[in-house]
């Protein structure tokens, strides 16, 4: 039976995301699971525009942006040791991790 575990990571800070990806890759390599990735997924860019003045001057606006960086890691036939190590993985705040089998 061929199983694969998809690990999707999202974060606003790409450095935190890359550190977490490196940790997962190290866990996978040390436990002997076959790994595909990390695959960089498209970055979602959201732009917010607000008025600078509360009353007039609609032409005076300020723009802010928020970028959501994403990565995908695929483990093929994950070993039980790999699954246990991933359960114990401490993920920093600001990184969202989703597992799919």
UniProtKB/Swiss-Prot annotation:
SUPFAM superfamilies: Ribosomal protein S10. Keywords: Ribonucleoprotein, Ribosomal protein. Part of the 30S ribosomal subunit. Involved in the binding of tRNA to the ribosomes. Gene3D superfamilies: Ribosomal protein S10 domain (3.30.70.600). HAMAP family: Ribosomal_uS10. PANTHER family: 30S RIBOSOMAL PROTEIN S10 FAMILY MEMBER (PTHR11700). Signal peptide: none annotated. Coiled coil: none annotated. GO terms for molecular function: structural constituent of ribosome; tRNA binding. It comes from Ureaplasma urealyticum serovar 10 (strain ATCC 33699 / Western). The gene is rpsJ. Belongs to the universal ribosomal protein uS10 family. It holds the Pfam family Ribosomal_S10. GO terms for cellular component: ribonucleoprotein complex; ribosome. GO terms for biological process: translation. This is Small ribosomal subunit protein uS10.
């Amino acid at each position: 039976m061929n199983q694969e575990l998809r690990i999707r990571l999202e974060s606003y800070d790409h450095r935190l995301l890359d550190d977490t990806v490196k940790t997962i890759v190290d866990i996978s390599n040390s436990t002997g699971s076959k790994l595909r990735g990390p695959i960089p997924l498209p970055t979602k860019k959201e732009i917010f525009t607000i008025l600078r003045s509360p009353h007039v001057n609609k032409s005076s606006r300020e723009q802010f942006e928020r970028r959501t960086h994403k990565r995908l890691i695929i483990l093929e036939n994950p070993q039980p040791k790999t699954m246990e190590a991933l359960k114990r993985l401490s993920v920093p705040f600001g990184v969202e991790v989703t597992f799919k089998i």
